[in-house]
Amino acid sequence: MSSEEGKLFVGGLNFNTDEQALEDHFSSFGPISEVVVVKDRETQRSRGFGFITFTNPEHASVAMRAMNGESLDGRQIRVDHAGKSARGTRGGGFGAHGRGRSYSRGGGDQGYGSGRYYDSRPGGYGYGYGRSRDYNGRNQGGYDRYSGGNYRDNYDN
């Protein structure tokens, strides 16, 4: 039995919730071997999610069912098995629609436990918030804005 089986993803954390507070709220469900609150690499500020690993996977399942949707430090938290992907369990990610980012970045097959906890881009906040441009300076959106804004094809005329 691997430690991944007893590993839970905890999302929606208050930015002030630390490892000790997280452990305090989950320790009543059984022995915990590891608690991690994921932090931004540059600012060391919490990214609002973390992981808890129980020594017994059954304890993790009980904790997940009991704590999912509960309030922790004034925020409603989401608890799920760390190995599951966001797409497979929530139909597309946890509220990431329209912002260009989800917890399981890089595709639907990579779960929360994939090891991609940090945003490696400078600043860490620019991902997905603007239109990307190609090397000619044109938008990669649905139409070329320099063509007069006509985004309809010839079949619509």
Swiss-Prot record:
Induction: Up-regulated by hypoxia. The modification Phosphoserine is found at S147. The keyword Transferase does not apply. It comes from the Eukaryota. The keyword RNA-binding applies. It holds the Pfam family RRM_1. InterPro entries: Nucleotide-bd_a/b_plait_sf (IPR012677), RBD_domain_sf (IPR035979), RBM (IPR050441), RBM3/CIRBP_RRM (IPR034278), RRM_dom (IPR000504). Arg-105 is dimethylated, probably to asymmetric dimethylarginine. Phosphorylated. It is found in: Nucleus; Cytoplasm; Cell projection, Dendrite. Residues 6-84 form the RRM domain. PROSITE patterns: RRM. Residues 81-157 are annotated as: Disordered. Keywords: Cell projection, Cytoplasm, Methylation, Nucleus, Phosphoprotein, RNA-binding, Stress response. The modification Phosphotyrosine is found at Y155. GO terms for cellular component: cytoplasm; dendrite; nucleoplasm; nucleus; spliceosomal complex. Transmembrane segments: none annotated. Its main location: nucleus. GO terms for biological process: positive regulation of mRNA splicing, via spliceosome; positive regulation of translation; regulation of translation; RNA processing. The modification Dimethylated arginine is found at R105. Residues 105-114 have a biased composition (Gly residues). The modification Omega-N-methylarginine is found at R47, R105, R121, R131. One of its GO terms (molecular function) is ribosomal large subunit binding. Gene3D superfamilies: 3.30.70.330. Interacts with RPL4. Associates with the 60S ribosomal subunits in an RNA-independent manner. Associates with ribosomes. Cold-inducible mRNA binding protein that enhances global protein synthesis at both physiological and mild hypothermic temperatures. Reduces the relative abundance of microRNAs, when overexpressed. Enhances phosphorylation of translation initiation factors and active polysome formation. This is RNA-binding protein 3. It comes from Homo sapiens (Human).
